[in-house]
Structures are given as C-alpha cells and as structure tokens.
Amino acid sequence: FVDVSRKKIAAEVEVEMAGLDVSAERKKEIVERRLRSEINRGVQTIQYQVVTLMTTNGQAPFITVFMYLGEARNPQEKADLAIIIEETIRQRYQGVKNEAGVWITPAFPKLIYVLEEDNIRPGTPYYYLTELAAKCTAKRMVPDYISEKKMKELKLSKGETPGHGDVYTCMGCRSFLTPDRFTDAGVGNIANAGNYEPGKHKYYGRFNQGVVTINLPDVALSAGGNIEKFWSIFDERLELCHRALRCRHDRLKGTLSDAAPILWQYGACARLKKGEPIDRLLYDGYSTISLGYAGLYECVKYMTGKSHTDPSATPFALSIMQKMNDKCKEWKTAENIDYSLYGTPLESTTYKFAKCLQKRFGVIEGVTDKGYITNSYHVHVTEKIDAFTKLKFEAQFQHLSPGGAISYVEVPNMQQNLEAVLQVMKFIYDNIIYAELNTKSDYCQVCGWDGEIDIVEEGGKLIWRCPKCGNTDQDKMNVARRTCGYIGTQFWNQGRTQEIKERVLHL
C-alpha cells in the first residue's frame, strides 16, 4: 500500500510540476514528504478508531499489531514496512489525548515488535527501530517482543530442523497457533483463503476454538499433598477439561458461514459459500483448541513446600507441564483436533479461582492466602529475582506452552536508562520466544500528577490514590497497568488489584 501511494503521489507531483524547472531529486523529496504525511494520518486514524470503537460488551477491540520486517517480500517492501513501523512506534510513544488534553498511554492496539538479525545490534540496518522501540517501551509499556531466533528454533512443523521454524504473531495477547500441519499434509486451501500460497505455511486467518482452564492449586489441595493422589486427581481433572473442550468444539460443529459473514465468507477466517458449514475448519490443524492452566507456583508450593524456582522443585513443575502436553498430544492424535497447552492469563478469573480455593480449603499460607493465584507458570509476583534470571527460568516453561504464553519483567521508570532496556531486549532475543517489560503510566486529572498512582487499603478495600493530592475518584485519573498480556486502563477487581500492588521490581 505504501508503494501504491508513492506512485499515486508521484503522478500528482508530475502534473503539478509540469513546465517547471524542478529536478528529479527535488520531486522525489516532495513525494517522500507527502508519503510520510499520508502514513502519519493513516496510522493515527487506526489508533483513534481502535480506542474509540466499542464492542458489544463495552470494551475496545482486543487488537494486536505485528511488526515483523521478515514478512517483507523484497528490499523496497522492507524499507516501506520500516516506515510504517517507525510511525506506529512514534505515535504510541506520543500517546493519545485524554479529556484534559494530556497525552496518556492507550491500551490498544497492542504492539508486538520482532527482534531479528537485521535490528538487534548496533550497526544492523534497522537498529534505529529497536532503539525507538526501547524508548517507547520505557514510557508506554509497548511494544512487546518476539524473538525471531527462538521462534525459528522452537516453532517447528513436521520435518523442520531448529533454526528453520516459522515466525508468526500470537492471537490477542498470547494465544499461539500450532505450526501449520495441514499444508504439509497436502490438505490444500480448505478455507478457500485469498492469502493461501501452495506449499507455504499459513497463519493469518486461522483461529482458536476456545479455552478451558484447569486450576492446578485445586488439584494439589484436593490431593492433600499426597503425590500418588495428585497424579490420579490430575488425570481426572484433565479428562473433565477434555469433556468441556469437546463441548466447545461440538457447539461449533454445524455452524453455518451465515452466522458471521465477515469471519466465514468475507475472508477474516475463510471464504466459504453462503449456507456452508464451517466444520472442515475445525480439523486438520487449521484451528486450535486450548487446554489452559493456572497457578503452577501455588500447586508446586503446596506439594513440595518450595517455589518452583527452587532447583529441587523445578523438575516436579516441569513434569506437570509435560503431563498436560502429553494429554494434548493424545487427544490430538485420536481426534485430529489441534489441542494445545495455553498459559491462561486469568485477567479477572484469578480472583474467582482464589476465592473458590479459600472457600473449599481455607486460608493456607503461601498457597491460598491471596486474592489471586499466579498467572500460568510465572514466578510469584512477590518473589525477589532479577530480570535475566526470571526470563531464563521461565523460558523452559514457555517452550512447554505451545498454545500460548508470555513472560514479563517488572521495571521502574527506565526513560533515563534506555541502555538497560536494550540489554533486556537483547536477552529476550537470545533466550525466550515472547516477553514484555512492565512499568507504570498514570495521570491524575485533578492535580496533573503524572507519576505512579498508589494502591492503598482503606476500610478493608484496595483503592487507587494520587500521592500528590489524595484524589481517589477513578473517573478523574488515568491508570495504565499490565494486566497480564494486555495493558489495562479500566481498573480491576480486588484480587487483580492486590496482585498488581504486590509486584516486586526485577531490575
């Protein structure tokens, strides 16, 4: 599209400059300046349309923008893509204006920037984009980062060797498709997709059928700490999840393309005929269905008395992950449905799970004594650990969450220490598929405070309070925090708020 606009503008300039003594170089400068202006307006339009559009449940659409230079088909297209990426990051750094006319951090669209050989080190052609991304992350918490190196090493289709896998975006904040197997199997263009290329792996347009999450601390507590009972109950709960996932799958079977034409007829997911069922898209790996899990830390803590970061407890934690992966593989082989293991974000369900555990088992120190349970495989938010050790440790678990997972490090204000941000980004590139940096981005509309707004307890309830003027009116403040994979700006329930309050810094 950039080159289409460039040619259109060039034709207009030729007409305008006809008969004038204007050099070709000068005309080119005019064309590129106008092109940049058009890109600026286009990116701005997308940003403001996303943050002002509401879905039927009153939320902004959960949209993710994937910025990967490796998708370009030729050098000119890569250079043009770099222009769009640069403009997108610059505008996110600037932010959007709130009611008071102050630039604040928007929640959407989520931005993902791929770290690759062309941009990861000083002297590489697009390192300037990586420096700009670091600057933006330090202020606005995005973009998040995917490592081309680790994806190519770990996201492998049948027959591929490490280093030759596929690089593709997640859906939403963390849900990853399984590597394309239907193309390798010769199934063909089952979605009648316009972007299908014979023999080339396909990711855009595929989808997920749904998620069912197993509460791992509940399994451990139900077993009373007995290891034999644990594995027995674990098997029972996994089969219960399997039945629930089949309910989701069977509910989709028989759905006609007319139910959502934009998805099934006009190319978002497929180009099926009117009245055609979507059933064939539910098999052969075109779509995935996810077994989610939560609270690995609390599960291991109860069973072993130690954090899963303890070397003596880590093997048990990994064996739990492997067990869930083995079940997904077993179901997939039997049913030709792509089950995959997914690190559930638990944006608000964390509070529900925690309260249910307390009701069933009481308050147990280190296990059920919080208003939340830990996201997926993550290190507990209160555990003191440095950023690099945390990412390295969690990488082994992320590899065992092929259906989706994300790791993060909590950092202070890094706007004056961008070199440290770049060091973390380089570490991500070398060690983990997908990670993000969390900071704070707040604004008090009463007094103009733009530092961190505090979480304090008042009357047995956690509230947000401006440290400068004492404002506690949530309608008169802008607070942006990483909920899990997304940035949240609409405040949270008491469990998630407690989790946010208790996060320790890793850098």
Locations of the language-model features?
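Conserved catalytic cores of very large enzyme subunits
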Residues: 1-285, 306, 310-468, 472, ...
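Metallocofactor- and cofactor-centric catalytic cores in central/energy metabolism, strongly enriched
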Residues: 39-43, 47, 301-302, 496-502
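Contiguous, well-ordered alpha-helical segments that form the cores/surfaces of helical PPI scaffolds
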Residues: 67, 289-302, 322, 482
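Generic secondary-structure boundary/loop-capping signal
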Residues: 211, 216, 286-290, 481-484, ...
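Glycine-centered flexibility sites
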Residues: 292-295, 403, 485, 495
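Long insertion/accessory domains within large nucleic-acid-processing enzymes
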Residues: 470-507
